[in-house]
Amino acid sequence: MAALSLSVSTVKPLSDRVFVKVNASEEKTAGGLYLPDTAKEKPQVGEVVALGPGKRNEDGSRQELEIKVGDKVLYSKYAGTDIKLGTEEYVLLSEKDILAVVI
């Protein structure tokens, strides 16, 4: 069996799913102390890198997503599925898990 190679360009979300590149969490405190991985808070901000086509309405048409690729978004802390591609962290979310677009 051939190995599966994933990259951002090969991930295409379905339905109302949103693929978000997670902003790195702080490595050290304001006082200069380095934080161990167990003490870091899970990031809640990231950049949208891919969108699904939207959820289907009862009449079969698609409901367009309110966000677009490139938007910086704030999402629920424990929402979605965490995915690591190379050294980068991503999260696959449902549109309803996105709380706001950060301007």
UniProtKB/Swiss-Prot annotation:
The protein here is known as Co-chaperonin GroES
Q: Name one GO biological process term.
A: chaperone cofactor-dependent protein refolding
- Looking at the UniProt entry, the stretches that span the membrane are none
Q: Which family does it belong to?
A: Belongs to the GroES chaperonin family.
Quaternary organization: Heptamer of 7 subunits arranged in a ring. Interacts with the chaperonin GroEL.
Q: Which SMART domains match?
A: Cpn10 (SM00883)
Matches recorded under InterPro entries: Chaperonin_GroES, Chaperonin_GroES_sf, Chaprnonin_Cpn10_CS, GroES-like_sf
Name one molecular function that GO assigns to this entry. protein folding chaperone
List the disulfide bonds in this chain. none
GO cellular component terms listed in the entry, alphabetical order: cytoplasm
PROSITE patterns per UniProt: CHAPERONINS_CPN10
Organism the protein comes from: Nostoc punctiforme (strain ATCC 29133 / PCC 73102)
Q: Which UniProt keywords apply?
A: Chaperone, Cytoplasm
Q: Which HAMAP family match?
A: CH10
Main function = Together with the chaperonin GroEL, plays an essential role in assisting protein folding. The GroEL-GroES system forms a nano-cage that allows encapsulation of the non-native substrate proteins and provides a physical environment optimized to promote and accelerate protein folding. GroES binds to the apical surface of the GroEL ring, thereby capping the opening of the GroEL channel.
